Amino acid sequence: VNILIVGKMNKSDELFSAFSMLSKKDREAFLLKIKYVEEERQAEKKEPSILTPEKVQNNRFANDFFCPHCESRHIVRYGKRPDGTQRFRCVDCRRIFQATTNTVLGKNTYRNQEKLRMYVNCMCKELSVRQSAKICGITVPTAFAWRHKILNALRNTCEHQMLSGTVELDRTFFNLSFKGSRHASEFKQLIEKYDKNKESLQQVCVPLAVGREGGFTGKVSTLGWSSTDTILSAIKDHLTSRSKLLADAEISQNNQNGKVLRNVNLTTVKGINEDRSLDAVRKFKQGINESINLKFRGVATKYINDYILWYGFLHLSKQKPKECENLLYDIALYSICSVNTRSIGKQMMPIKLSSGQKMLLSEFLDGLAENTMND
């Protein structure tokens, strides 16, 4: 009598059996995923290097010394602090600074470097301010200030992107929001039917542009409906003579861009054409709307430009997530941050108003002030 003993397959045998049943393309994708996970694991094992004044100075002034106040290159050494940190003096504006001046954390860089690394990781995961504060062990106001300081440094570093070649153009709308303001946040949004010929106080128009060769831009242009010229004016600083714009019929139907851009070709997209599709910018538009309206539950209008730049940096970059995190950490450490904790909330809304909108907004703010006084 022959007895056949069948042993149980262990997990490795089951995995190998399942792997052998995959197609060649799926096996290659699976191996690449394993390689990526292993690289992430090795990167996490590496202990982060401790920042020193010398390291910050060498990294921030790697190319040349500059003044973080006026960006002059005429710099002289001006002694050292008691802890050994080198000081500098600008010959032009005559102000004294050190390697951490006008950065996100300033003089607290060395003390809070570990928390800053954790906070940058939270930003790359697009966590809320309260979630980030809890994870990093900081207060909610501090987490809010760090977010907007990092976004300001990111804007100073990445805002001036040039879009050459084929550029897809679209626009989106967000409700006018005073979120975070002590008084104007009481403004109740009304459900207003969209009318392109009506002066509106309800929504702001945000032109979006994505280059197929890389790069993106998105800025608040005006309240309500925007003409083609207004949309093109918002992005013209990011275009070159080689830029070829693709837009849908609604944007280009009143095309008078010759008055604004003489060297840029604007083409209307009609039907389904792979070369003239708007898939990239529409995907960008959908992601921004979901991020701002759903994930963050609305963003104050004066901060929308920064949030668009943040989203594009994370999702349109060709780098891996860990590389994006390291780059954002370096930007937070070494790039110029032109705002401080007190000035963050005093930013103005980046909106160009028509004469009718100025009158309507003035009446609205006057009424809001009267209601506040009565309360």
What are these regions (language model features)?
Residues 1-375:
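Residue-level recognition of single "structural anchor" positions
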